[in-house]
Amino acid sequence: MEKIWKEMYDAAKAVLNARQITEYVSCGEVAAAVCSKSGRIYTGVCVDTACTLGVCAERNAIFNMLTCGEQEIDKVLCIMPDGSNGAPCGACRELMVQLMADKYQDVEIMQDFAAERIVKLGDLTPEWWIK
């Protein structure tokens, strides 16, 4: 496995911090790391609200990447509360596809860090609804 995956896992784990902000808002139960094409790692946590205005950890990390002036994603990893990994939800996949419409197929997604199982976004999202 490439060294960058360990760096991403550690970066996401460092911000994984589940907490209740108010009776309506919680955050940090899921954390994500996105590696841009430049090799820089951006992190984010999920924000859950009582009225569905929350955001997934992956999108939060992508928004941090965009805030810092980058827009090309190379790798994505998310960590669940138990330390396991999972695939991005449909909304997160859609954002990645729209950001990289002609290149999204090659974005790497960590499915299982312990087993070193990596898939391509193109395998998870083989046909984009717009094209």
Language-model segments: what does each one mean?
Residues N60, N64, P88:
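Feature captures the catalytic cores and cofactor-binding loops of soluble hydro-lyases/lyases
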Residues V45-R59:
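Compact, glycine-rich, soluble single-domain proteins
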Residues C27, C56, Q71-I73:
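Short connector loops at helix/strand junctions that flank enzyme active sites
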Residues R40-I41:
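Hydrophobic "anchor" residues
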Residues M1-T22, E70-K131:
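C-terminal binding/interaction regions
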Residues N64-E70:
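Alpha-helix C-terminal capping segments
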Residues S26-S36:
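Short beta-strand scaffold segments in enzyme catalytic cores
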